[in-house]
Amino acid sequence: MTLRTLVIAGFCAFVGLVWIIESGAADVFLEAARPDFQKIPLAIAGIENLGGTESPEGRVKLGSRIEEVLKTDVRRSLVFALVDVNGLGIKAGQLGAEPDPSFKHAVENGVSVVVWGRAGIKSGNKDSDVNMDGYVYDAGNNEVVGGKRYVGSTSVVRLMAHRFADELVFRYTGEPGIARTKIAYVSELGSARELFIMDYDGYDPRQLTADGFLNLMPRWSPDRRFLVFTTYRNRNTQDIDLLELATGKRWTLVSQGGLNITPALSPDGNFLAYSSSSEGNAELYRMDTHSKAVQRLTTNAGGDLSPSWAPSGRELAFTSDRSGGPQVFLISADGSNVRRLTFEGDYNAAPAWSPRGNWIAYVCRTPRKEYKLCLITPDGQKRVQLTTGPGVDDSPSWSPDGRHIVFSSTADGKSHIYMINTDGKDLERITFTGTHNSAPTWSPAS
């Protein structure tokens, strides 16, 4: 069955298609993923606990919890190489706000950065204030180059650690870290599909919609304030809505009749690309988000959908079956210069353009008829398969630093959200609740 047939077949067939075609892949492309990239050796001396626990039951020491989150964030940054502090002779409880003589031994053992801190709770209830002081020693300068106090309630302890990690990344790369980013996704609730949001590491999942409809294919606005998504209010109408995260307010952006699907906002937020069958065939359209003027971008006998913007905003990748089976194509933002990108394999769909611009992830069907994630350069000269193993891998979305991809997979039976580095390493499952979690989309950096 062709992609066009599936799209035109209607509601039931299309819902089945959504879980298959919204996919992608990944590979090495950024400084931290290059074979010659040297991670910065970093030792976390510890977060000294000055009193209090993260939970009112007293089970988790505050300092230990912050240290655990910080270590995970630093590891996932792919900027630093964590060095075991055992044997280095440095302990957070013995450190002040100045370089310590014990750092000399650490530096002799290859450490470039030492991080430590202190944390305590002012009073005994769970809503009391937490003070966390974080320090950074840089061996190159032989000085403490960072010292900062973080203050908040016990409910934001993880956020404090995330912020500290992001500031470390920014200090040493000049780029925002990803520890405070969010991932929106779709979760099955009975016969409905509702939108959820969670921290990038899977913590603190929160439901965004609760209307009992099918709410699918969310995508972020560049300012992180909104999500655009397709909503199925009935069997014959699929609209594109805008959801304001801070207030929960919703607006309908596209209601042209027929299928209105796979929305994607441009990097500057000025345009919305989407697919619509309002004129009979699934074609790509572009809406000016200010004037609401709509321009049709494609006209052909095949079905066109799943647009993904290049970071420049000048091009889009999309899926089309105009050549037979689903393949990835490129098109200029004004509808000109359409060309086919993928030629290997009979099924390539759901492209996701990396924020660095030099890779496009997509779903590829292997010779063994497995749906996996692949990467291809925009010039088509290099292609790699990222994922292997059991299950259907689907719905890729890039981290804002371009070092990771989040996607859904049925590797464990049910569909859940996973994260993987762009070199294919460190595969991690990050959702553990819900019966079916899919269509993840990674927020821009804060």
Predicted regions and their residues:
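Bacterial N-terminal signal peptides
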Residues: 9-19
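Amphipathic beta-strand/beta-sheet edge segments enriched in Tyr/Trp
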Residues: 18, 27-28, 96-167
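Short beta-strand->alpha-helix linker/helix-N-cap micro-motif
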Residues: 31-102, 115-121
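Short loop/turn segments that connect beta-strands within beta-propeller blades
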Residues: 140, 199-203, 244-248, 288-292, ...
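Pro/Ala/Gly-rich low-complexity, hydrophilic intrinsically disordered segments
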Residues: 157-192
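A flexible loop/linker signature enriched in serine peptidases of the S9 family
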Residues: 176, 187-194, 211-213, 230-240, ...
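Hydrophobic beta-strand positions that form the internal "hydrophobic ladder"
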Residues: 183, 224-227, 269-272, 313-317, ...
